[in-house]
Amino acid sequence: MIEDDNPEIRQQCEKLGEYFSSIGERSLAESLFIRAENAQRAVEIHIQSGDWIRAHQVAQEHMKSDEANQVLAKHAESLQQNGELRHAESLYVAIGDHDAAIAMYRKAGNRSDMVRLVAQHRPDLLQTTHQHLARELDAAGKAREAEEHFLGQF
């Protein structure tokens, strides 16, 4: 019988996990990292490969909820800083932080994606969002764009 709490076994599982991750065997690497009690690394291999759904599943299954959300939010922020807004959005939405995704697009000046997310996740705020954007654009002298939002609120 193999004892799970043996540090040498956990260390070997870590090494094997890194090896299998490096050759693209994410499923096996994930199992080894979980066995080594390193759920965060298991989540990271899925994030690195762009498998946001699996990263979220592993985090939810093997980490405390707040810890999982914190790890995924940290990666979303990193993706956002690197300009990978769609990937960051996927992570924010996966952890239920729709407002962070909306704010990210607002900060980036990407109004169409911001409005899309408001419509999907905060429909009660859609009209208010259009009004605010219309006033903001009108004040900036962008009458044509403002008009689209004035019309979008009806």
What feature does the model see in each segment?
Residues M1-F154:
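Extended alpha-helical assembly domains of large eukaryotic scaffold proteins
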